[in-house]
Structures are given as C-alpha cells and as structure tokens.
A protein has these predicted regions:
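Amphipathic alpha-helical extensions and coiled-coil-like segments
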Residues: 92, 96-176
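Short, conserved phosphate/pyrophosphate- and ester-handling motifs at nucleotide-, phospho-/glycolipid
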Residues: 6
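Amphipathic, charge-rich alpha-helical segments that serve as recognition/docking helices
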Residues: 9-106, 129-133
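Short active-site oxyanion
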Residues: 1-2
Length: 176
C-alpha cells in the first residue's frame, strides 16, 4: 500500500501505539491520480505559503489536463465534461481572480523561489505578483537581497535590484 494522505494521522496513531488505523483504500494504481490526491490534500490545508500554493495549483492543472479532466484553451468544451478555471477555483474555495493571481506566482524563476522560500515575501500575494512581472535578472537579484537580509522589505529589495541594473546599463552606455 502507498500512503497518499493522512501522514499526520498515521504518526499520531504510531505515537499512541495503536495497531489499527481507519483508512480509505483506493484500488486506483495510477501515479497521476495519487499525486492529484496528495496535491488536493495539501491545498486544502492552510499550511502552504502563497508561493507553494501557486506551484501546487499549476501542477494540479497539469495533472488534470493529462487525465483529460480540465478544459484547454482552443478545445471544444461542450463535447466533453472538462473543468474550467472557474470550477477549479470554486473547488479550492477562492474567487477566480485570486486563483489566477496564485497561478501567476508560479511564473517566478525557480532559483528565486528557492531564495525567498523562507522569507515573509513567500506568503505575500501582492509582492509575489509584482515579482512575477519583473525580468528574470531582477527576480534573481531580489531573491538574493531578501535571502541575504540586505533589505527588510520586498519594496526595498525590488528598488535595490532595479537600481543595480539601471546603474549597470547607464555605465555601459557612458563607456561607449
């Protein structure tokens, strides 16, 4: 058997030295379905940061597309029962706009995500949306600044990063 969800419950029962644990056993042997169930459970908890939530939402959509459960732009949505973004956002109990913003967060450069994962910015939707709209070099620089605690706020880190690249561009133009 493979444990897909309920790890905290399993550990609690082990600590209590109980030999029987109530469980739901699925006969499904599809790894994608297992991954989808795990993602659903993680998204239903409130322990994820906004940064993690965005990645989970995008991965969930990719799996649903592979399983033929999500509608894709350009396909005929009337011939099959595929879910739309509106339906997916309702399932997660969020409005469509918030859902779209959280998906946008996943566009942040992977190296930057790792750098900011343990900062306050990782849980601030507005800051993450702003960061996702920046060029990759600015994103990475903001990540380094926040990770190294060279700035206390996201806005300050963004200003420092943009200034660095404006200064380097200005210097190159003057050398010519």
């Amino acid at each position: 058997y493979v444990l897909i969800s309920g790890n905290h419950r399993l550990n609690s029962f082990k600590l209590l030295k109980r030999s029987n644990i109530p469980a739901v056993v699925h006969e499904e042997d599809n790894a994608l379905v297992h991954q989808l169930i795990e993602l659903e459970e993680n998204l239903s908890k409130n322990s994820l940061t906004v940064l993690e939530e965005g990645d989970h939402i995008v991965l969930r959509e990719k799996i649903l597309i592979e399983l033929g459960q999500k509608s894709v732009a350009g396909s005929n949505n009337y011939t099959k029962k595929a879910m739309s973004n509106a339906t997916l956002s309702e399932q997660l109990k969020m409005n469509k706009r918030t859902y779209q913003y959280k998906k946008q967060v996943s566009k942040i450069n992977e190296a930057t995500k790792k750098l900011i994962a343990d900062t306050k910015t990782a849980d601030n939707l507005n800051d993450l949306i702003t960061l996702s709209r920046q060029p990759e070099n600015v994103q990475i620089e903001v990540g380094k600044i926040l990770h190294n605690k060279q700035a206390r706020t996201f806005k300050r880190a963004l200003l420092m990063a943009k200034t660095k690249f404006i200064n380097s561009t200005w210097t190159k133009e003057n050398e010519e």
